[in-house]
Amino acid sequence: MKTIKIALFHYHFLPGGITTVAINAVNSIIKYASLNSFKIEEIVFISGKEENLENIIQKQIEKPEDSETIIKYDVDNSLDYLADNYKYDEHDIEEKIILLFKKYEGFIWWIHNYQLGKNPVLTRVITDHLQKNNNQKAILQIHDFPECARPENYRFLAEKKYTIYPIINNIRYAAINARDERYLKEAGVPDKMVWLLYDPVSGLSKKQLIENSKIKNSNAKSLATKSDATADLHKKKSSKEKLIEQFRKTFPALNPENDFGLYPVRTIRRKNILEAALLSKITGNGFNLIVTLPGISAQEKTYSDIVKECFEKGYIPGIWGCGSNIYGEPVPLDNVINASDFVISSSIMEGFGYHMIDSLLWSKPLITKYLDIQEGFSDIFRNTASFFYDFITVPVEKKNREKITQLYFDSIRRYSKIMGAHNIELALQQIDSILTRDSVDFSYLPVYLQIEILAKVSDDKAYRKDVKTLNNNITEKILKVIKTKQHYDPLKIADYFSFRSFAAKFFKILNSFDNDLTLANLPETDNSTNVSDNEIVSRNLLNLFFRPEFLRLLLSER
């Protein structure tokens, strides 16, 4: 039995994606530590912000009764995001981080998104410290890359010559999807340093799923199922009526007669909300789009406010922000799920994509844009009520296409200091080929034009007919899928995403520090003598992500 302590680092633990992952991950490893021959003495959540930490410790960490693991938190503002609009004392921040690290010597470090460029000082201090202290073991878990659609973040790290991905034997890189795992290896990180660690999903106890499957076909279960179905219909009707009553005066295009398509996300640019809105207007007689949360960061608030205004003006049928307190008491997510007929996503960039897994667990049909992060677990959607579409096209006048092309050229040339001329020219040619056609992939349009198209679809019958005709194959499939009962294989999902599966992989990573002779014999590296080797991984990642789908104007930081 190995005894360990874990220090879990992130910029913040505010409600959201990475926080959910961290909570589920901690619950996983506490529950299954002994099964994997580990004893966890202590886990510390270490953050740049105190907000929400007490709530996590008191209410969201689920310790088994026999667990002796101590759970606590520590806060130091040196870990927080560094704002771009003021001068900060880099030396002062560095000293604080080093003092913090000294407190947690002897712990396994589990650091999330350390390299994102949101706090470049933290990135540098982490990688320097790990290179100089080869007894300090660290799992560096990557959810997002600065090399992917974040040129300002990446440029700052690159210009400062910061090491981003050191190749040293006391580090393991954890990727949350198969594409990212593949990219890290292709970029030059040794295979045995890179591990695929899918985000854990709660509610996937294999034992309980097996028990449920055993009684599924019994007579008692059959009778109970009919009773449950009636109760579910009543609950759905009641939840839908409450939502309509609460929001019909705020959102004039909300249509009580149409289906509810749930998009359970924050309103941020990469979620490409307005494409889902377009689908809500051209699919059959239309459906209500339900978007749960606003965007909150400075970079996303403008986009969030624009989408909010589109709902309020009636450009988009449905409800926006029902999970926030903007319009009064927030509606619990369970109530919104109960009211919904299917789950929809038009996201153009995801790390994991919880909504896809959740749609199955909620027994809701799924309509989603295809993303390459799905390549590792696409088999769980086989024979389910799920439809993956590639793109939605709309007619765009030549003068607008020429204007958009220039916007792309200006945006892509921002990479000129960090990308070679050949790569820049190739990207420009690819974008030009996308925009020379009379009909254009909606997700490549700037936000202002997306809004104009939504308004035109509402007001111009001829244009609406053209858009419907262009996308008829897709909308016909959507109409079929959303009326299909959701079926899935729960045991297959559990194999990928259960707490037990996550814990087994996590502890296997920890064992690899001691068990892998190949890695144990890796030469020690030093930041000052091996700069070129350290830079090549990041440079290769930049090339892998330098593709039109990651250069969309929607992802632009300006």
PLM-predicted stretches and their roles:
Residues Y88, I97-L122, K137-Q141:
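Short N-terminal targeting/anchoring amphipathic segment
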Residues L14-P15, K31-D89, I97, L116, ...:
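N-terminal strand-loop element at the rim of the active site
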Residues A7, E211-K216, K221, D232, ...:
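Conserved donor-binding/catalytic core segment of Leloir-type glycosyltransferases
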Residues Y303-V336, F381-T393:
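Nucleotide-activated donor-binding/catalytic signature segment of Leloir-type glycosyltransferases, i.e.
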Residues M1-K59, L130-Q136, R500-F507, N511, ...:
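N-terminal subdomain of nucleotide-sugar transferases
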Residues S386-R558:
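C-terminal amphipathic helix plus adjacent low-complexity
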